[in-house]
Regions:
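Proteins that catalyze or organize thiol-disulfide redox chemistry
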Residues: 1-26, 31-56, 64-79, 84-109
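Conserved residues in the N-terminal Rossmann fold of short-chain dehydrogenase/reductase
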Residues: 59
C-alpha cells in the first residue's frame, strides 16, 4: 500500500511528519488484511499526487504501530485523521469518497 506520493509513518517519524508539519496531513490508519482499506488506498494516492506540495498523505499500519493506534483511539479501520498545525481537526472512520476527502481538506485551508 506504499506509494511514492504517500509517507509511511511509524512511531519514530510520526511527530516530525505530522505534528511538526506546516502542511495539512491526512493520516490513514490501515491494515493489510482490511478490504475497505485497500479500496480507499487508490483515492488517497490520487490526492497525494494532486495535492503534492500543499498536503501530506501518510499511512500508519495498525498491526506494526499499535501504540499510535492506541494514542489516537483507533477502534476501526480505515480511520482517516486530518491534522493541521499539528492538531487533530477531523476524523472519518470507514469508506468515503474522493469528493468528501477533498472537501474536508479544503475546510482545513
Amino acid at each position: 500500500m506504499e506509494n511514492s506520493a504517500t509517507i509511511d509513518l511509524n512511531e519514530a517519524n510520526f511527530e516530525n511528519e505530522v505534528t511538526k508539519s506546516d502542511k495539512p496531513v491526512i493520516v490513514d490508519f490501515w491494515a493489510e488484511w482490511c478490504g475497505p482499506c485497500k479500496m480507499i488506498a487508490p483515492l488517497l494516492d490520487e490526492i497525494a499526487k494532486e495535492k503534492s506540495g500543499t498536503v501530506k498523505v501518510a499511512k500508519v499500519n495498525v498491526d506494526q504501530n499499535q501504540s499510535l493506534s492506541i494514542k489516537y483511539n483507533i477502534r476501526a479501520i480505515p480511520s482517516l485523521l486530518f491534522f493541521k498545525n499539528g492538531r487533530l481537526r477531523d476524523q472519518i472512520t470507514g469508506m468515503t469518497n474522493k469528493k468528501d476527502l477533498i472537501g474536508r481538506l479544503d475546510a482545513l485551508a
